[in-house]
Swiss-Prot record:
This is Glycerol-3-phosphate acyltransferase. Pathway: Lipid metabolism; phospholipid metabolism. One of its GO terms (cellular component) is plasma membrane. Catalyzes the transfer of an acyl group from acyl-phosphate (acyl-PO(4)) to glycerol-3-phosphate (G3P) to form lysophosphatidic acid (LPA). This enzyme utilizes acyl-phosphate as fatty acyl donor, but not acyl-CoA or acyl-ACP. One of its GO terms (biological process) is phospholipid biosynthetic process.
């Protein structure tokens, strides 16, 4: 059951809402425009607020839905987290789009929302605060993501290992942004 749900979560995660919405609207391919990342921030830059909001909702949903299905199936918190991580992996390396995906922040937030909703609050607050001062989405994401870990470790310790791995993957996917930040070349809004 766990493996089947993980495979289905990966396949769901492989749906790139940024790419699909761009194709449906006749807009540019987010992998070829702006930052080249098929995610919410790049969609905001190249396609506007409406498509960016739809991308965000879709990416959140594909992280949330597999966790909720795993909960409904009676699986434990750690199994739910691994299944959520499979959805994030699909977002990062989508089967349907030549394994060229996004950075996983919104999908990870959806996963976390399913695992333990109160842990999302400090992360969202930190993201908004850092973004308000820096106008840099990547820095806000990197600052916000680890803030959910202590609360999650306290309330859902079984999910901590998959979440630590998830954080490592998100940092890895932002390595280009980190280099640009340190070089003073990172894009701002």
């Amino acid at each position: 059951m766990v493996w089947l749900l993980a495979i289905l979560a990966y396949l769901l995660g492989s749906l790139s809402f940024a790419i699909l919405l761009s194709q449906l609207s006749g807009g540019p391919d987010p992998r070829a425009c702006g930052s080249g990342n098929p995610g919410t921030t790049n969609m905001l830059r190249i396609a506007g607020k409406r498509l960016a909001a739809l991308t965000l909702l879709g990416d959140l949903g594909k992280g949330l839905l597999p966790v909720l299905i795993a909960q409904h199936a009676g699986l434990g918190v750690q199994q739910q987290a691994w299944i959520g991580l499979a959805a994030v992996s699909g977002h990062l390396y989508p089967l349907y789009f030549n394994f060229r995906g996004g950075k996983g922040v919104a999908t990870a937030a959806g996963m976390l929302l399913g695992l333990y909703p109160p842990a999302v609050l400090p992360a969202v607050a930190a993201w908004l605060l850092v973004f308000a001062f820096t106008r840099t989405s990547s820095l806000a994401a990197l600052a916000a993501t680890p803030l959910c870990l202590p609360l999650l470790a306290w309330r859902q310790p079984e999910a901590l290992l998959p979440m630590l791995l998830l954080y490592g993957v998100i940092v890895w996917r932002h390595r280009g942004n980190l280099h640009a930040l340190f070089a003073g070349r990172e894009r701002h809004f």
